[in-house]
């Protein structure tokens, strides 16, 4: 069985990843550590402090997967290029964050309200970005088939976090 460490903003940073590897060693360390999300800057100027979190030197030996939170496919593709330049082979797109501050901006699970926008976003990413890109999401019954069609069309590795699925179905039906 593979062990993936889920991202939790403000908790699973590089210090946590290093400590986890140190104390649990090769036998107990995660097979992958998903980094807390970063949003690509609209002005396309990287923020040094945020990029320091993902610097390979700050994550020695840790198989880290950067996670992007975006709603513009072209901008996300640009950010993926920047992460590839740092040596990352896989990048994860976050379509699952249920936080109100995120969904209000049409990002994370807020993007799932408009499947045409999801399709356009994924087209923007996959028409420009190269290499493996996975998608983290939460699935509500009403969108599962459509979203799976988008995923299948692009041969995306899909990661589903089940924990809040019931809450998401409830809140999605209220809107």
PLM feature spans:
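Hydrophobic faces of well-ordered beta-strands that scaffold small-molecule active sites
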Residues: 3-6, 33-35, 64-68, 91-93, ...
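Conserved phosphate-coordination/catalytic loops
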Residues: 70, 112, 116
